[in-house]
Amino acid sequence: MKLPMIDQLEKLTGHYFKDKKKLKKALTHSSVQGSEQGNYERLEFLGDRVLGLLIAEMLYQLFPQASEGELSVRLNSLVNAQTCADIALEMELPVMIHVGFEMKNLKGRRLTNMYADVIEALIAVIYLDGGLESVRPFIQRYWQSRAKQMDAGRRDAKTQLQEWAHVQGGVQPHYRVVKRSGPDHDPVFMVEVSIPGFASEIGQGNSKRCAERMAAEKILRREGIWETMEKNNHE
């Protein structure tokens, strides 16, 4: 790895890298053939756990009144692939990633996942270099402002309910129309949303989408997710 690139990464992360070989590995995709130093997959595995721990710690400190459910939703939003990929782009990491020829034209979700994997691998290298105390400033630098700005209580209710349901046990909300009434030009839909292990709720609206959103909002409020988020966002 060229010295200017290492210098740039050290400025971006605020960390002096002791193990340059691991740093190179963190930026190498498995599609690179004959790579002696290996690829980032094992580092990504470790970095994912370190990121989750430090984000959980940060949220616990930032939102002392938040319920476990709210913290889980916020955690999921901050460690998901899209957020990590956004940070990779902010750091201009994509130009530093080594990939095989067949991966040069990667697009969409697979590209997002690769960027996220590299961020997590980079976190692992910092952790192996200096432990949690070395990683914490990096996490605070790129994630803390996102955590503070996140108005989770006002995000799309269906998306938030899906995230909340996932952290409850990997389940998904199921929506079904239970009734449709009114004329074609002014219909009224009643939609039931159910989640395994929880009581269902029914929402009403002039479209299926609106009724689904209303039903999702009812569960979020009933379970205390929106209530605590709204309280925290006004403090």
Curated annotation (Swiss-Prot):
Q: Write down the species.
A: Bartonella henselae (strain ATCC 49882 / DSM 28221 / CCUG 30454 / Houston 1) (Rochalimaea henselae)
Role, per record: Digests double-stranded RNA. Involved in the processing of primary rRNA transcript to yield the immediate precursors to the large and small rRNAs (23S and 16S). Processes some mRNAs, and tRNAs when they are encoded in the rRNA operon. Processes pre-crRNA and tracrRNA of type II CRISPR loci if present in the organism.
- Oligomeric form and interacting partners: Homodimer.
Location within or outside the cell: Cytoplasm
- Presence of keyword Hydrolase: yes
Ranges of residues in domain RNase III = 6-131
Q: Which residues bind Mg(2+)?
A: E44, D117, E120
> What name appears for this protein in its UniProt entry?
Ribonuclease 3
**EC no.?**
3.1.26.3
Keywords attached to this entry: Cytoplasm, Endonuclease, Hydrolase, Magnesium, Metal-binding, mRNA processing, Nuclease, RNA-binding, rRNA processing, rRNA-binding, tRNA processing
Needed cofactors, names only, are: Mg(2+)
Return the broad EC class.
hydrolase
State the family it belongs to. Answer: Belongs to the ribonuclease III family.
